[in-house]
Amino acid sequence: SAPTFGLCLAFRIGFRLEPKGRTGFAHLFEHMMFQGTPNAPKGTYDRVIEGGGGVNNGSTRYDYTNYIVSAPVSALEPVLWLEADRMKALDFSEKNLSNQKEVVKEEIRVNVKNKPYGLFFWTDVAGTAFDKWENAHDGYGSFTDLDAAQVADVKSFFESYYGPNNAVLAIVGDVTPEEAFAKVEKYFGSIPARPTPAKPDVAEKANTKERTLSQTDPLANVPAVAVGWKLPA
């Protein structure tokens, strides 16, 4: 089999850290990370990785946003260059932002608004179970908040949360730790740290009684039930 590697670059920014009035912003920014940089225009990231026999993806979670790559080990250095390049700067154009707002809104239409049950087992359960806004709000975001996002907001979000001091990079596969550390230092070592905002207190008090929510879904043909328990973070 051909030697391969897997890479995961995770930033400590997810739904919980979104500012109020900017619901869905962490997910929107995940999309912006694929819109190119001054050095690698839009499409370069995918073209280099896929052209080298690799695949890539990204996802936004409650506590982090991650970007993953799996490729032949010969592509490790180009991939590290690409990741370091977009950690330094992105193409913050109004055109890219407007385009990705519509992409995210279409995801909401497809996965939530026009899909049987939507994501009730995620968004509606969280909104019922938790008291603090950071835990309870819909991470997909409202159309109103997404439409209100400006290029200045994107730049501020990037500077606040996408520095090397707020990231964790993991590499596995057919590469030695010494080789991996040396290559990472080569491409990321000169990127300066950035100040990050104070993390909010997201701790919740234990529930003292059952919480329930009942709702109708005109798109669903049969009933559905979701049950959740609060567990230690």
Describe each region flagged by the PLM.
Residues G36-N39, S70-V103:
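M16/insulysin-pitrilysin zinc metalloprotease superfamily fold
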Residues P72-A75, G173-E178:
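Helix N-cap motif at beta-to-alpha junctions
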Residues W81-R86, A182-F188:
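Short amphipathic alpha-helices in soluble, non-transmembrane regions
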Residues T23-T37:
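Active-site SXXK
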Residues D91, K95-K105, R109-V112, P116-A126, ...:
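Non-catalytic accessory/assembly modules
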Residues S1-L17, A40-A75, N111-N166, S190-A233:
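Non-catalytic beta-strand/loop surface segments
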